[in-house]
């Protein structure tokens, strides 16, 4: 029954506000009247909704200051959204939470950078060791005279043994 009475009271106050506005603004060409009435209706509704919420919150909460602050910030944020603003009011607690989150993310990224840097240093050292093992070391001058095909290059007199080693030999087999 109390809720019904409260609803009737709310409706009668809204009607009273509308009647008062109609009598004050008798000019039928008033273009801003619907907007003014809407804003006043929203303000009254917020007022009626916030008072019982605040009473319950203050009775049940041990930390009433934070509850009051949170309710006021919520009401102002609602009004800002209704007005079309995208910005919001934040409390110091929310700012501290966001700063803690940012600091935690920065620490995580610094640790990741440190790990990646360590891995890159290890990879560079590994590549240096591989490069050192693969380095060609000069062993001095190698005599390649015996290694190339000299059949078409040297004559019979120029061979060391005096004969061409590439010519076929006569082989006799015993029968």
From Swiss-Prot:
Top-rank taxon: Viruses
Full protein name: Non-structural glycoprotein 4
Organism of this sequence: Rotavirus A (strain RVA/Human/Philippines/L26/1987/G12P1B[4])
The keyword Metal-binding appears for this protein: yes
Signal peptide limits: none
Glycosylation (residues): 8, 18
Keywords, alphabetical: Activation of host autophagy by virus, Calcium, Enterotoxin, Glycoprotein, Host endoplasmic reticulum, Host membrane, Host-virus interaction, Ion channel, Ion transport, Membrane, Metal-binding, Secreted, Signal-anchor, Toxin, Transmembrane, Transmembrane helix, Transport, Viral ion channel, Virulence
Ligand binding (Ca(2+)): 120, 123
Topological region Cytoplasmic: 52-175
SUPFAM superfamilies in the record: Rotavirus nonstructural proteins
The record's note on its domains: Binds 1 calcium ion per tetramer.
Family the entry assigns: Belongs to the rotavirus NSP4 family.
GO cellular component: extracellular region; host caveola; host cell rough endoplasmic reticulum membrane; membrane
Known role: Plays an essential role in the virus replication cycle by acting as a viroporin. Creates a pore in the host endoplasmic reticulum and as a consequence releases Ca(2+) in the cytoplasm of infected cell. In turn, high levels of cytoplasmic calcium trigger membrane trafficking and transport of viral ER-associated proteins to viroplasms, sites of viral genome replication and immature particle assembly.
Membrane topology: Single-pass type III membrane protein
Membrane recorded as keyword: yes
One example of a Gene Ontology biological process annotation: monoatomic ion transmembrane transport
């Amino acid at each position: 029954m109390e809720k019904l009475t409260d609803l009737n009271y709310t409706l009668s106050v809204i009607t009273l506000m509308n009647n008062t506005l109609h009598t004050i603004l008798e000019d039928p060409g008033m273009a801003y009247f619907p907007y003014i009435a809407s804003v006043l209706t929203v303000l009254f509704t917020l007022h009626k909704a916030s008072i019982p919420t605040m009473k319950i919150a203050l009775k049940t909460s041990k930390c009433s200051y934070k509850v009051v602050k949170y309710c006021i910030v919520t009401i102002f944020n609602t009004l800002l959204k209704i007005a079309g603003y995208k910005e919001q009011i934040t409390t110091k607690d929310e700012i501290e939470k966001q700063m803690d989150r940012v600091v935690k993310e920065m620490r995580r990224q610094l640790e990741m950078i440190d790990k990646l840097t360590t891995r890159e240093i290890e990879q560079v050292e590994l590549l240096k060791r591989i490069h050192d093992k693969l380095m060609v070391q000069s062993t001095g001058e190698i005599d390649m005279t015996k290694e190339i095909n000299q059949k078409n290059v040297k004559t019979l007199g120029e061979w060391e043994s005096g004969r061409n080693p590439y010519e076929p030999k006569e082989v006799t087999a015993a029968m």
